[in-house]
């Protein structure tokens, strides 16, 4: 069984910007352990004679060529913005100085 520590769960919650309780931390650790144990079943799958692939479907690029087009005027883009600064959208900070 793969053991997920409470420190790992707390770190994941921090990265996801989630505040979770002690009870939720324990529950999440158990859930992650179950998921990892289930995924570990792939280690025993017989892949003899199966060609390695990076995707299950044969993909082709169906995108168009990039072409520069005229965008909307800045004034129009910022018209309904809650807050602007120096001609840009201003949003609440999501990272502190240590993480930047």
From Swiss-Prot:
Pfam families to which the protein is assigned, alphabetical: GatC (PF02686)
Keywords from the named record: ATP-binding, Ligase, Nucleotide-binding, Protein biosynthesis
Catalytic activity: L-glutamyl-tRNA(Gln) + L-glutamine + ATP + H2O = L-glutaminyl-tRNA(Gln) + L-glutamate + ADP + phosphate + H(+); L-aspartyl-tRNA(Asn) + L-glutamine + ATP + H2O = L-asparaginyl-tRNA(Asn) + L-glutamate + ADP + phosphate + 2 H(+)
Keyword set includes Acyltransferase: no
UniProt-recorded Gene Ontology molecular function terms: asparaginyl-tRNA synthase (glutamine-hydrolyzing) activity; ATP binding; glutaminyl-tRNA synthase (glutamine-hydrolyzing) activity
SUPFAM superfamilies (UniProt xref): Glu-tRNAGln amidotransferase C subunit
HAMAP family: GatC
Record function comment: Allows the formation of correctly charged Asn-tRNA(Asn) or Gln-tRNA(Gln) through the transamidation of misacylated Asp-tRNA(Asn) or Glu-tRNA(Gln) in organisms which lack either or both of asparaginyl-tRNA or glutaminyl-tRNA synthetases. The reaction takes place in the presence of glutamine and ATP through an activated phospho-Asp-tRNA(Asn) or phospho-Glu-tRNA(Gln).
Subunit comment: Heterotrimer of A, B and C subunits.
Protein's UniProt name: Aspartyl/glutamyl-tRNA(Asn/Gln) amidotransferase subunit C
Source organism (scientific name): Staphylococcus haemolyticus (strain JCSC1435)
Gene from which this protein is expressed: gatC
């Amino acid at each position: 069984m793969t053991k997920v520590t409470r420190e790992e769960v707390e770190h994941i919650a921090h990265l996801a910007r989630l505040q979770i309780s002690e009870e939720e931390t324990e529950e999440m650790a158990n859930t992650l352990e179950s998921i990892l144990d289930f995924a570990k079943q792939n280690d025993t799958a017989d892949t003899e004679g199966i060609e390695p692939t990076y995707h299950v479907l044969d993909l082709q690029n169906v995108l168009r060529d990039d072409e520069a087009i005229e965008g909307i005027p800045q004034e129009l883009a910022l018209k309904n913005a809650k807050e602007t600064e120096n001609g840009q959208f201003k949003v609440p900070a999501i990272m502190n100085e240590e993480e930047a």
